[in-house]
Amino acid sequence: MSRLQFQLQATDGAARRGQLSFPCGTVQTPAFMPVGTYGAVKAVLPGQLCDLGAEIILGNTFHLFLRPGLEVIADHGGLHGFMRWNGPILTDSGGFQVFSLAHRRKISEQGVTFAAPTDGAQVFLGPEESMKIQKVLNSDVVMIFDECTPYPATEDVARDSMELSLRWAQRSRDAHDALDNDAALFGIIQGGVHPDLRGRSLDGLQAIGFDGYAIGGLAVGESESERNVILEYLHPRLPVDRPRYLMGVGRPEDLVESVARGVDMFDCVMPTRHARNGQYFTGFGTVKIRNACYARDVDPIEPGCGCPACVGGYTRAYLRHLDRCNEMLASMLGSLHNLWYYETLMANMRAAITAGTFFTFRHSFYLARGLDPPPLPEVASCAG
């Protein structure tokens, strides 16, 4: 029996408000998961993540397997003890990272052989290996091992990739169960930008049975409209009583539009990566702190913001100075602000769904940026 319980608490159109319950904590959905690739969210302490509103974080199976290795993490009792994070952790399977290696990998029915980016050594990773690694990591949500369908891809290529991922999904399920792992196991829907293939993938995954369903392969270069078509197609077909996770998609606009199409969970490196590159998210758009107009700007990043950087009185001029001098404090303060913005955005969407005002919230979200809200399809007004 999985350690995860999911409760759907409210809907507003297709937008869903729910709760994930684990022995180590609860997660309110829609939820954004900060990414801790190497066992840390860059420039942010675990305790600060809690203060920012994060309730679940993501760890990277592929990178942690290569460095520091499973023995070191096992010495700490798993990833929670290693990271000093007491809340829930989701680990990806390593499939996307292997996909990103491009010319340094060879895919077979059994799995993937690749040259490790750390030392060039030949490494094999398949469904069984991924499940064993994630068992040692002791994460609360385990992802199946899949092949991330490339973009662009012909329908034949996307079909072959999707069918391989389905066979790997069954092997992941079998291996996970054989390990007697009570962590939740999520399936990953593939099929590229072809709705019928996505539907076949979902049907196959539901026949196997999973605790949640992720939508993979939608952060690899496709257009926003192509992504939305897939979300709109899947929304009425996904089981209502299982969480839905859109992998790797993370602009604020993407989060709002995906919540409007029924998504519950998100992850992305964007908040911290953009902070390290001098870009700060606000309700009125993005502050690009390297622009000369901020050289003597004594306002905080966003007046009225409750993050430590803004409440602390750090000005745009100061942050620009730190950034230009490559001071790590710029990355720290910017990451705190961006993660606060993301977690607050999710909290505001949750409150709006509960109140039945999500589409009013969505309209205001765009107006604050000086934009007209994009049109919504009929599916977004259908509960599920």
UniProtKB/Swiss-Prot annotation:
Zn(2+) binds at C305, C307, C310, H337. It comes from Xylella fastidiosa (strain M12). Belongs to the queuine tRNA-ribosyltransferase family. Its EC number is 2.4.2.29. Its cofactor is Zn(2+). It catalyses: 7-aminomethyl-7-carbaguanine + guanosine(34) in tRNA = 7-aminomethyl-7-carbaguanosine(34) in tRNA + guanine. Residues 248-254, 272-276 are annotated as: RNA binding. The active site is at D92 (proton acceptor), D267 (nucleophile). The keyword Translocase does not apply. One of its GO terms (cellular component) is cytosol. It comes from the Bacteria. Pfam families: TGT. Homodimer. Within each dimer, one monomer is responsible for RNA recognition and catalysis, while the other monomer binds to the replacement base PreQ1. Catalyzes the base-exchange of a guanine (G) residue with the queuine precursor 7-aminomethyl-7-deazaguanine (PreQ1) at position 34 (anticodon wobble position) in tRNAs with GU(N) anticodons (tRNA-Asp, -Asn, -His and -Tyr). Catalysis occurs through a double-displacement mechanism. The nucleophile active site attacks the C1' of nucleotide 34 to detach the guanine base from the RNA, forming a covalent enzyme-RNA intermediate. The proton acceptor active site deprotonates the incoming PreQ1, allowing a nucleophilic attack on the C1' of the ribose to form the product. InterPro entries: ArchSynthase1/Queuine_TRR, TGT, TGT-like_sf, tRNA_ribo_trans-like. Substrate binds at D92, S93, G94, G95, F96, D146, Q190, G217. The gene is tgt. GO terms for molecular function: metal ion binding; tRNA-guanosine(34) queuine transglycosylase activity. Binds 1 zinc ion per subunit. Pathway: tRNA modification; tRNA-queuosine biosynthesis. GO terms for biological process: queuosine biosynthetic process; tRNA wobble guanine modification; tRNA-guanine transglycosylation. Keywords: Glycosyltransferase, Metal-binding, Queuosine biosynthesis, Transferase, tRNA processing, Zinc. This is Queuine tRNA-ribosyltransferase.
